[in-house]
Amino acid sequence: MCGIAGYSLGPESAVEPTVAARALLTGIAERGADAAGYAYRTPAGRVDVHKQRSGATALLERIRVPEGASQLLVHVRDHTKGHPSLAANNHPIRHGAVVGVHNGVIDNDDALFAVYGIDRAEPGMTVDSEIIFALAEISRGRTGAALEQLYGTMATAWLDEGRPELIVARGLGRPLWLGRGKHELVFASTRLALELVESYVGIKLRKSELPEGTVVAVENGKLVAKDSFQVDRSFHDDPLPAVRAPDEARSCRERLATLHVAAA
């Protein structure tokens, strides 16, 4: 059980990128403490990735999102496949030009790597989530069809250095919330994360859950495309509690409040 979050900001948005990133990280901190990380698209179009083997609190003060970086991905990990001792297994995951985050389990990743003859991005990688971003890279323009090949559970998002949009998708069995502001679109595994953005950034978001079997493209804080894909509901996994790291949640909330007061 992991946590994902992120945003797309329009050019007229007054949201401070780092403050929003910290709020989102805090809002998903409870969902895993094996690793934490974030990625953003630079104004030049490159996606920079930062991750470490820790819970959210240790990352909170280190997050720096530069002005002009209007797209963000955030992740906390409660690992299943792919040990966190190998940094490449932790999120955000890069496969070629695609960088993404995922909450869930993909059961047929090895089979799909073999069918398509795709090599792992780095030696020793075993994380199942990588197949999402490998398929995304070879299936540009056919995202829904690519997602239909995945067998498992999924809430995911990615940035592609070859395309301008942020892609957000929800498959089977994992929560994913969208928050729409005047010039912003924010997503997260928890409603709490969106509420923290509202509180610390000072914007109002219209909150709703993304339906299962839905993929959206977001650019400049606006939804620019939406598609549906078939979800294979025959997959079943053992349910896990959503709160995997309660101590991280508490300490992250306390530290976020302290940082906010210090910056005021």
Positions of the model-derived regions?
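Conserved short alpha-helical segments that host acidic/polar catalytic motifs at enzyme active sites
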Residues: 1-264
